[in-house]
Amino acid sequence: LGCSSQLFAQSKYEYGPVSQRQEGVPQGKVTQHRWENSKVFPGTQRDYWIYVPAQYDKSKPASVMIFNDGGGYVRENGHSRAPVVFDNLIAQGKMPVTIGIFINPGVIPAEQAGGKPRRNRSFEYDSLGDLYARFLIEELLPEVEKSYNLTDSAEGRAICGLSSGGICAFTAAWERPDYFTKVVSYIGSFTNIRG
């Protein structure tokens, strides 16, 4: 039994064709940003990235997909390579022009020099209620909309996450079905719910 698990652990994951750069497919642009002005999660700081496909036209509202724990999804060498997948699927006409928003959970800076920052991930992701949905709807998405034309249709909005990010995605859509109709919860940690 131990041997077989070691064999699986040593197997190299191979990306499928849609996760690899394809010749002739236009590449979108990814920009990194920092959010430090949250009223919903005061005192937190977080990085987020915006992916804009090459086919984006400001005169037409784009669909939007939010990724919790976004840093893992946005990296070219990450587990999902989401921008590459988006480039390929949009070019193939298999998904609409979609802006990706990749959000890391908040961090509360150290109070003293040499201290460690406090991660706010469990509070933001594992709590039931509308706080995270409010953070997105009232704070972060309006900031992104200053630069990009995002759809106002719930049918054109999706949210996803892995583990605690998955329960967070589910909870945001549960609390605001008028805002999110598509949810991807990869092995959502429904047992980590704070109560």
Where are the regions that the model predicts?
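Non-catalytic cap/lid and distal C-terminal segments of serine-dependent acyl enzymes
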Residues: 8-195
